[in-house]
Amino acid sequence: MGQDQTKQQIEKGLHLYQSNQTEKALQVWMRVLEKSADPAGRFRVLGCLITAHAEMGRYKDMLKFAVVQIDTARELEDPNYLTEGYLNLARSNEKLCEFQKTISYCKTCLNMQGTTVSLQLNGQVSLSMGNAFLGLSIFQKALECFEKALRYAHNNDDKMLECRVCCSLGNFYAQIKDYEKALFFPCKAAELVNDYGAGWSLKYRAMSQYHMAVAYRKLGRLADAMDCCEESMKIALQHGDRPLQALCLLCFADIHLSRRDVQTAFPRYDSAMSIMTEIGNRLGQIQVLLGVAKCWMIQKELDKALESIEKAQELAEGLGNKLGLLKLHCLCERIYRTKGLQQELRDHVVKFHECVEEMELYCGMCGESIGEKNNQLQALPCSHFFHLKCLQTNGTRGCPNCRRLSVKPGYV
């Protein structure tokens, strides 16, 4: 298959894919991959296969194609192809929650400066890197990457990238409990979809609605959360988007948990867990297990709650997800307090505070913790964040956290 025929078949596959005939599109692309003698065409068709498998949640296949794509890029001996290939490797590992590998591949991309593609892709690389740092609960670096990605989006007038970054920022602020910003950013993403997204994939709309649902639930606006989550789920089902279906099921379960309707929450947690296990979303599995533990706690089934927490702990330690560990120590603290087991209670209190220290989840001005309850936060240009009220009260003559870090232990 020559260059022109390869190009024609790739377009045919894209047309099928956009009209929701995914399996037929995959067949066309696989045929191109087998028969095309044109390396640049093979590279492009691998890109299509990577995107399609990502959207279906077939992350292991996505990674497999990304590895073949890197080999094709090396064959082409073109740094532009290599940059794109490494970004796809980074993304595949991000989806499989291999966050250290993601960061490493992203750094490789950023080191390949000077290529024309790198200038277009730097924003996407920064976004993927930010998501990986967030998965590891390294909040300052995550925020730094998201802000960099947002700058690239603004400078290149890339509204799609801006939309994706806004969703990630929504997730970031939901985790550290500034719920006002957790809602603001996905609302901004939804606005971008309305204003510019006529020709975009519907996944952008679905994604922004899902993140709005999460924020509404955390703000206690459960009816609004349900509406947004239903809208997102509808699109996810139409498009066979398994990863998003799993997240929506988790969100539905969390909404029912907020209503203390444990019987309705349980089957939704089970369905979410089943998809997340199938696709390899271990970060999502931790959230499901913590939700299930809370359900058991409501039912006063404390030993069953501890079983769920134990499974979550194994996953969180494996991934290096410190926020997950902090949350489970917090739940254990409540369980052992109820059981009257003082030694275990003390152990988890100590571990809880170790997690807070490690993640630097406290305000450098007042010393109070961040992420314990809903609080308006404000980041300084260095990406350290503080309580907004502390910055307003004390003003800022530079960042107190940066000042502390610059004082060498030898001079203290």
Curated annotation (Swiss-Prot):
One of its GO terms (cellular component) is cytoskeleton. TPR repeats lie at residues 6-39, 83-116, 123-156, 163-196, 206-239, 246-279, 286-319. It is found in: Cell membrane; Postsynaptic cell membrane; Cytoplasm, Cytoskeleton. The keyword Cytoplasm applies. Pfam families: Rapsyn_N, TPR_8, zf-RING_2. Its main location: membrane. GO terms for molecular function: acetylcholine receptor binding; protein-membrane adaptor activity; zinc ion binding. It comes from the Eukaryota. SMART domains: RING, TPR. GO terms for biological process: positive regulation of neuromuscular synaptic transmission; synaptic transmission, cholinergic. It is a peripheral membrane protein. Belongs to the RAPsyn family. A cysteine-rich region homologous to part of the regulatory domain of protein kinase C may be important in interactions of this protein with the lipid bilayer. This is 43 kDa receptor-associated protein of the synapse.
